[in-house]
Design a protein with these regions (language model features):
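Beta-rich strand-turn-strand
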Residues: 93-101, 147-161, 167-171
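A short, glycine- and basic residue-enriched loop/turn
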Residues: 137, 154-155, 176
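Conserved catalytic-core motifs of eukaryotic protein kinase domains, centered on the activation segment
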Residues: 120-121, 127-129, 189-190
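Glycine-rich NAD(P)-binding loop of Rossmann-like domains
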Residues: 77, 129-139
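Domain-scale signature associated with acetyltransferase and cell-envelope carbohydrate enzymes
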Residues: 1-117, 140-141, 175, 184-225
């Protein structure tokens, strides 16, 4: 689409429909979901398995050809879990797969087609055992993960880190570090006292995400009738 010709009132009605769908059909699949979630095309978001938790003001942008999925391996004796902080953003095509535990901190920014998994899902030799090797993945606050990146089992990523597009992350990333490549390697260190501006600051109050989205669409659709 080259230009969205809808008037703002038409977008507002569509947004109400998306919000209602989120509340009635998507939210019940979460173990817990904070208020003010904003999900674009929520029918393209899949939550499979128990123990998927998300904080306040989560923002998900999905498409038919780029669905977003949160998947938990759930054997009865030791189900996995996913914990997502406040004010996180998930673009289309993202896959989060937990056999044990994945934690994503506040204000995380995940670009399209990112994959995060805490398991290999099969052994190198034993490819049929139902208990795959796994290790928790911990992602800090204000982490930015570029498009198409892969984060594997046992990885810890520190606060404010940046993961370059299409990077393959198999080892820990220190806080305030930019990594890129396959495998990912440090290419820059950020000033921990630098002028960071985070989604948590912008959207931290209860109505922040609603105000941000309404302002953005009013500006985009102004003049349409």
């Amino acid at each position: 689409m080259r230009h969205d010709h809808r008037p703002y009132w038409m977008h507002a009605l569509w947004e109400q429909f998306e919000n209602a769908w989120t509340r009635h059909f998507l939210e019940p699949h979460f173990e817990s979901l904070g208020g003010h979630a904003k999900v674009v095309r929520p029918w393209n978001v899949e939550v499979f398995g128990p123990n998927v938790h998300a904080g306040q003001a989560i923002h998900i942008v999905s498409r038919k050809d780029q669905p977003v999925s949160f998947t938990v391996w759930s054997p009865s004796d030791a189900p996995g879990e996913i914990h997502i902080g406040d004010c996180c953003f998930f673009a289309g095509g993202i896959r989060i797969l937990a056999a044990e535990k994945i934690v994503i901190g506040n204000a995380a920014l995940l670009a399209k087609s990112v994959t995060i998994t805490d398991s290999d899902w099969h052994g190198l030799y034993d490819r049929i055992t139902a208990r795959p090797p796994s290790a928790p993945v911990i992602i800090g606050d204000n982490v930015w993960i570029g498009a198409g990146a892969f984060v594997g089992k046992g990885v810890t990523i520190g606060d404010n880190a940046v993961i370059g597009a299409r990077s393959i992350v198999t080892k820990d990333v220190p806080a305030n570090t930019v990594v890129a490549g396959a495998p990912a390697r440090p290419i820059r260190t950020l000033d921990p006292d630098g002028p960071f501006k985070t989604r948590l600051e912008m959207l931290g109050d209860a109505e922040g995400l609603d105000r941000f989205m309404k302002a953005a669409y009013r500006d985009q659709l102004k003049g349409n009738s």
